[in-house]
Amino acid sequence: MSQKDTQQEHAERANPVHEQDNAPRIAVVTDSAASLDPKLVQRLSARGNFVLVPMPVTIRTPGEPDRQLQDLTAAEVDEAIMLAHVMGQTVSTSGPAPGMFADVYDDLASRGFTHVVSVHLSSELSGTVEAARTGARLSRLGSEGVSVVDTRTVAGAYGHAVVRALEVLNSASAGSSVECPSPGYSTPNYPNPDYPTAAQLVDYIQSICEQSTLYFYIPTLDALRRGGRVSPALAMVGQMLQIKPIGTITEGKLTYVERPRTAARALERLVEVTVQTCRDQRHAAALTSAAAPEMNPSPACFSLKATPRGEVVAVHHVGNAAQAVQLYEQVQQMLGESSLVHDTADSSAPEVLVSALPPVLSAHSGLGAVALVVY
C-alpha cells in the first residue's frame, strides 16, 4: 500500500462522528521544532487529522554537495552535527517553503477537512509562521480556512499544546468527554455533544503556550554563534569565561536566565529554577481556585480552559537522554513526587513528553543540551 493510500485510510477513520456532509472537521499541523518523539508523531498521525511538516537542516562544506539531515536517525544526527561543529562546517536551518504548507493544506482539504489549525514556533526565531500564512493564502482553504498560530515559544512548550489539542479533537469526535470546567472547577469531565470550533482550539493552544515555560542549558555558545543566534563577540567572551548559560524564551525571543561558569552549577540551577517555577504556578493556581466563586458545573457546557498544574510536561536532550531524565527526576524529588516518564510507544499522549531535540534545534544548541518545560 502506498503512503498516499495509507493517509487516505487514516483520514477515513478520523473524526467518525463528523462524517456527514457539511460537518466541521479540523486538522492540526505543526513543524518539527515542536520536538515530538517520532513514535508519538506516528501514533498521533494514525487518525489522519495531524501532519508534522519537517524543517530542513543542511551541513555545508565548501566545494562539496550540501548534506541534508532530516532522513537520519537521532544518533546519526547528533554525530553529524558534532562532527560539523568540530570541523568548522556550517550547519544551517530554514523553515519549510510556503509551497510545502500549501500542499499540506490542500491535501487535508481534499480529505474532507474544513479547517486547519497550523501551530508553529515563535516568529521571532524563524520565518515558519510567515511561510505558513503564505501557504494558507495559496491553498484551497485560503486564509479563512487555515488558522496559523504563532506560539511565541519553541520545542515542547508548544509541542505539548499540540498534543493536548489533538486529545480534545479526538475525544470530541469519538463522542467521549473532554475537560469542560465552569468557573471554580478545574478537573471534572462532562459529556461533550459538540465539536470545538477552530477559534476555540486556537485560543486553547495559545493559552497553553502562554502559560508554559521552557528552560534550557547549553554547554557552549559556539553552536549558537554558528547558527547566527548570538554574536561572535559574545560567543568569544562566553568561551573565555567558560560560561554555561541557562536560557528561556521571553516574548518569543531567546533570553538568558543565568550564566554559570561550570556545567555542574548550570545543571544544578536548571533544576532549581524549574522547581521554583513549578511551585509558583501551583501557588498561583491555588489562589485562583480559592478566589473563584462556587458554581455548579453544567453538563451541557462546552469550554476549553487551559489550566496549568505546575508540572514538568516535556524533557528534551541532545545525545544525553539519561542525563535529561535524571534532571527531571531530581525536579520530581524536590517537589516530593514520583517520575511520570513513560515509553512514548505505549501511549498516544504520555504524561511527560521525552524526546531528542530535532536537528533544526540541536544544530543551534549543540551536543549535551537539555531543556525542561513547565506547565
What are these regions (language model features)?
Residues M1-A23, S177, P183-S186:
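Actinobacteria-biased recognition of intrinsically disordered, low-complexity terminal regions
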Residues E19-R25, A33-L44, F50-V51, M55-E64, ...:
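Mixed-charge interfacial surface used for oligomerization/domain docking
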Residues R25-I26, F113:
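Local beta-strand N-terminus motif with an aromatic residue
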Residues V29-T30, S118-S122, V373:
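Short beta-strand segments
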Residues V104, L108, V116, P183, ...:
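Generic signature of intrinsically disordered, low-complexity segments enriched in small/polar residues
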